[in-house]
């Protein structure tokens, strides 16, 4: 009896864990997604309906509750604006994410496409994310163009997302 319970428990745990493992081990996942933040999405695999949370590799967007300052000194939530921009970009579209990896924080990262366009670069080009030099220098040129055109976050005064996160950690201690 105890043995049967043990086997049943293991089977349930495997069933709960398996979709995440299988999604991460795949080379490519296509499906619809929802924006969780300006650089993170939850992708639903078209094939097996599993879901995986993916941060767009090589970019960094303001966090939710990260405020920016307008030229007139008004504070606005740039994290929400960045999330809404990503949400509008991916709405009702099928994404394909490839090159899955885990960064040093354990977050799953990927390069994602909307058709033949790289979503990661689209977000930086729109000005709602920055090149995340800790991972890649691929988007530095695109970031510079967005910054000079004052697109997205570049029209405001703000802390770089990684600096803002460090400050939040220090304040929480």
Predicted regions, residues:
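Small beta-barrel nucleic-acid-binding modules, primarily SNase/OB-fold domains
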Residues: 2-9, 13-173
């Amino acid at each position: 009896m105890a043995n049967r319970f043990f086997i049943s428990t293991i089977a349930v745990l495997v069933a709960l864990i398996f979709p995440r493992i299988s999604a991460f081990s795949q080379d490519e996942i296509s499906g619809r997604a929802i924006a969780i933040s300006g650089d993170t999405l939850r992708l639903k695999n078209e094939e097996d309906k599993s879901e995986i949370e993916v941060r767009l590799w090589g970019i960094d967007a303001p966090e939710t509750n990260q405020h920016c300052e307008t030229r007139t000194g008004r504070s606005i939530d740039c994290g929400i604006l960045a999330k809404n921009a990503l949400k509008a970009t991916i709405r009702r579209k099928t994404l394909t994410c490839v090159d899955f990896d885990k960064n040093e924080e354990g977050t799953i990262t990927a390069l994602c496409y909307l058709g033949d366009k790289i979503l990661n670069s689209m977000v930086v080009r729109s000005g709602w994310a920055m090149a995340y030099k800790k991972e890649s220098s691929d988007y530095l040129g695109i970031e510079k163009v967005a910054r000079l055109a004052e697109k997205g976050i570049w029209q405001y005064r703000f802390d770089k997302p990684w600096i803002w996160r460090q400050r939040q950690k220090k304040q929480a201690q």
